[in-house]
Amino acid sequence: VIYCADDAHRFAFTADEEMTAVPAYTSTLGAYLYEPSAAVLKAGAFKSLAQRFDVKKLHPNSHLYTSDTLHADFPGRAFSVERTCGFGKRELKAFCADTAQANLTVRNFPATVADLRKRLKLREGGSDYWFATTLADESHCLIACRKVSKN
């Protein structure tokens, strides 16, 4: 049994459970986005996590999950999805028009945070969280979220 723990959550799984788990993948975001804790990521609990919490993976290598249900006991951070967009020039311009500042994370994406921040003219910080990632259909997506208090 492999145990993952941080200040707020504990998650335990077996290597067999991880090997045999069959997660669902999606290119459509639900109401919530989940980012596993560092402990879960380091332990490699990617598929078993999706199966145990009935969340869908956005891509096999992105390690971001989505669901229409809020899972307060998910071992990591939860966000409410506000809006999404692709990476077309016009689409990005409209998406960024009303936001000057956000916390930006990239997962399985072909640009760095610094490069993307420069391209989007986005300052660090604030209460908005943006994720740039690759979806199950191999398309690139920008996701604007708000952090959810799971207490």
What are these regions, as identified by a protein language model?
Residues 1-151:
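SAM-dependent transferase fold signal centered on methyltransferase-like domains
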